[in-house]
Amino acid sequence: MSFLCSENSYQQQSKISIDIDKSLKNHKLKLEEEIRVLIYGQKKVGVTTLFKTFLLMGESQITPEELMDNRNNVYKTIINQLKKFIIISNNSKIELENNNNIQMSNLILELDSENFLWNKEIGETCLKLWNDSGIQKIFQSQFSEFFGYFFKHLQRISDENYTPTPQDLNFIKLTQNGIIEGKFTFERCLIKMIEMGIQTSTLKKWINCFSEVQAIIYVIDLSVYDIVESEDCSKSINKLEKSLNGFKEIIESKYLHGCGVIVFFNKKDIFREKLKTVPFKTYDKDYIGENDFESTTNFIKNKLLDYYSNPNKNVYFLINEESEVDICRSTFNILKDIVLNITYNSVKN
């Protein structure tokens, strides 16, 4: 894991950390209190994959009894999500592949989500519909990738001896507004991580829901610097620029002004390879730096820092370069530093 930037030197950070520890001890404040983190990024930048990595690396706070008690909730979640896809298909021009799939979709719609018995046949029906090209088109164009979690695990879930995993339960908590959260511990710190899978167009509607978070992890896909997508019939935008604009919108929100910020640069391997054949000038024609990894990432970093006007807080930059354990450890070390600084500043004030 590489640290591209921190506003203070490591020596300064160490001194600050010592001062903060003293203040925390004097005021009997404990870091063991819950650290609340929002993880966000544009569609398909790898937010859900990173979120699942954190959940898997952390220690679950869910008991075995709670796992079994939620078995039916897993089944209900699958049916309700599949119904959403089917209803969209029925109300749009996106048709299912054949009459057999249409008949199966009608059977799913007729199921009472609150009162039905899951069996192998229902599982097979759900899998066939999930693999339908029409359902896939709806999923890929209109839903965050975590909506597909249970469908990708249908074979395991349909086993008669199925017991939900802690990760399954975290994904049950998916709500209609596209928000999912998970609680876990990492190195004795209790983490509450929230993934915001909603679209950018509805961000302002929900951003006030996250006023209590202490840190933001904003994920950026480096490899899309040459890709332009259409937002509507009259407007198109570069995908990297869209991510940078999303970062600007997040950090300018009055509800998140007090948060620490971690920018997570993702898909660096694809980015490195693409630079060999696609000049970075494709993204910015005025770019005059070298066409190498370090120069281009520093350019992106500086653009993000230009958006960030809070002199009392650091922006941390991470690149996904090492093992999952190292990813988590580096991230959580920064989170602890962020929370300690927030606590220290509140003590001073």
UniProtKB/Swiss-Prot annotation:
InterPro entries: Gprotein_alpha_su, GproteinA_insert, P-loop_NTPase. The keyword Membrane does not apply. GTP binds at E195, M196, G197, I198, Q199, N266, K267, K268, D269. Gene3D superfamilies: GI Alpha 1, domain 2-like (1.10.400.10), P-loop containing nucleotide triphosphate hydrolases (3.40.50.300). Residues 33-349 form the G-alpha domain. CDD domains: G-alpha. One of its GO terms (biological process) is adenylate cyclase-modulating G protein-coupled receptor signaling pathway. The keyword GTP-binding applies. Residues 262-269 are annotated as: G4 motif. Pfam families: G-alpha. One of its GO terms (cellular component) is heterotrimeric G-protein complex. Residues 191-200 are annotated as: G3 motif. Keywords: GTP-binding, Nucleotide-binding, Transducer. Residues 36-49 are annotated as: G1 motif. Residues 168-176 are annotated as: G2 motif. Residues 320-325 are annotated as: G5 motif. GO terms for molecular function: G protein-coupled receptor binding; G-protein beta/gamma-subunit complex binding; GTP binding; GTPase activity. Belongs to the G-alpha family. This is Guanine nucleotide-binding protein-like alpha-10 subunit. It comes from Dictyostelium discoideum (Social amoeba).
